[in-house]
From Swiss-Prot:
Its EC number is 5.3.1.23. GO terms for molecular function: S-methyl-5-thioribose-1-phosphate isomerase activity. GO terms for biological process: L-methionine salvage from methylthioadenosine. This is Methylthioribose-1-phosphate isomerase. Keywords: Amino-acid biosynthesis, Isomerase, Methionine biosynthesis. Catalyzes the interconversion of methylthioribose-1-phosphate (MTR-1-P) into methylthioribulose-1-phosphate (MTRu-1-P). The record marks 160 as: Transition state stabilizer. Pathway: Amino-acid biosynthesis; L-methionine biosynthesis via salvage pathway; L-methionine from S-methyl-5-thio-alpha-D-ribose 1-phosphate: step 1/6.
Length: 364
């Protein structure tokens, strides 16, 4: 997508090195940084210089490629898989991308691994862009149907950032929105701030503003109120891991939005790229590990000071503890449908397997 009219991806190669947008500084500062070592790739994923399941996977793939150029030995391959895999436990794309790289590289002689790894990492990025473009095309049909029925503006609520900053390009939940904008449909987006890291306020709002999408930032607890009063036509969220039966693990607070949508008859859709499906897991609540992050993310907020610097400010009393689960699981029964690159389906095993029979068979 574009920043000030210039096309960008969230991760790319330039002058022989991998570069990313360091998202910790957005929206107040655009910092582009190189990643040159395995340690830097691990830090970028773990400390959320990059975030979003698809982008985490793409970053891990490039981390493997850079390490193979440094040391293509069997020991290095195994250690790099482990180091990168341990950075974020919830997002399934991380494991998927690392397994893709390991399957490709393990049978090859070390002398061939660096070139093969770089090719595959680039392919993973290009594949992600195409997957998200197709998700947008399918999701556009939902938005168009509402626009034709209402004969007016379509109001969409989204949670966290499932935009192009969470993928290589287009985004998942935002891709239908961008497609609708290009199609001339009048859309308005309610952006959840998404505490505690405020990815909605910091990142999604920045994306919407950069692309000229009409939007309002709302506090996390306002969504239910807006739905009660008929101000939300459609909810579209992303996912960090979706089970074989359609349970959706996404940023903390997604479950509450799904409950409110169900109670108020608002369609609740999940934009789901197929690499985010974990065909080995059936019960999301019982089986998906939920990352618990630092309590400081809850007790402190980061923002722009009057002098323009970005600072962290404590908001809770000294001595107050905080729980900080980063994700929750929305049961499939609350999901209206899954928007995938192959079409829209119900959040249930049979419908998902019908769209992706080869993936379901390989996991059986």
């Amino acid at each position: 997508m574009k920043i000030n009219g210039t096309p960008f991806r969230s991760i790319w190669c330039e002058a022989g090195e991998v570069r990313i947008i360091d998202q910790r500084w957005l929206p107040h500062e655009l910092r582009i940084v190189p990643l040159r070592t395995r340690a830097e790739f691990a830090a970028a994923i773990r400390d959320m210089w990059v975030r979003g399941a698809p982008l985490i996977g793409a970053t891990a793939a490039w981390g493997m490629a850079v390490q193979m150029a440094e040391d293509p030995s069997d020991a290095s391959l195994a250690e790099t898989w482990q180091v990168l895999h341990e950075t974020r436990p919830t997002a399934i794309n991380l494991r998927w991308a690392l397994n893709e790289m390991r399957r490709l590289l393990a049978p090859l002689p070390p002398s061939e691994r660096a070139a093969a790894a770089a090719r595959r990492a680039a392919e993973i990025c290009d594949e992600d862009v195409e997957i998200n473009r197709r998700i947008g095309a399918h999701g556009l049909t939902l938005i168009r149907e509402i626009a034709e029925r209402k004969r007016g503006r379509v109001n969409i609520l989204t949670h966290c950032n499932a935009g192009w900053l969470a993928t290589v390009d287009w985004g998942t939940a935002t891709s239908p929105i961008y497609h609708a904008l290009e199609a001339g449909i009048d859309v308005h987006v309610f952006v959840d701030e998404t505490r505690p890291r405020n990815q909605g306020a910091l990142l999604t709002a920045w994306e919407m503003n950069s692309h000229g999408v009409s939007h309002d930032l709302i506090v996390d607890n306002a969504g239910g109120h807006l739905m009660q009063h008929g101000e939300v036509d459609l909810v579209i969220v992303g996912t960090d891991r979706t089970t074989a039966q359609g349970d959706v693990c996404n940023k903390i607070g997604t479950y509450l939005k799904a409950l409110a949508a169900k109670a108020n008859g608002v369609p609740f859709y999940v934009a789901l790229p197929s690499p985010t499906i974990d065909w080995t897991v059936r019960d999301g609540v019982a089986e998906i590990p939920i990352e618990e992050r630092s309590s400081a993310e809850v007790t402190h907020v980061q923002g722009k000071a009057p002098d323009g610097s970005v600072i962290s400010v404590q908001i809770s009393p000294d001595g107050t503890g905080a729980r900080n689960p980063a994700f929750d699981v929305t049961p499939a029964s609350l999901v209206t449908g899954l928007i995938t690159e192959r079409g829209i389906c119900a959040a249930e095993a049979g419908a998902m397997e019908a769209l992706f029979p080869e993936a379901a068979r390989s996991a059986a």
